[in-house]
Amino acid sequence: LAIDSEGNVYVSEYGNDRIQVFNPQGRFLRKWGSEGSGDGEFSRPQGLAIDGEGIVYVSEYGNDRIQVFDPQGRFLRKWESEGNGDGEFSQPQGLAIDSDGDVYVSDQGNHRILVFKPTV
């Protein structure tokens, strides 16, 4: 669950492999994603975080990656590397973004927190 600067609520649906967005009054606005491993597809999306520019980060437990989208749900990029080395994931879950834009990833399978400095 994440809330953008306009108060819209973004919900990751672990069982339905999608993201849904609602306005502050709870009215459905849009959704994106489906089950799979391609760009814009999900396998058990978990964490959500939104940066100061409205960019949406989604952690995927099933695909061991982080996908990045614009506020409308258009795929921008991904961080994808399964394993236990630097920058690799095993069942990423929680996400957070600090005031500098650094992205924190709770990497459950590797029992650690990873920090990324995203580039445009």
Describe each PLM feature range.
Residues L1-V120:
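Eukaryotic scaffold repeat domains enriched in small/polar residues
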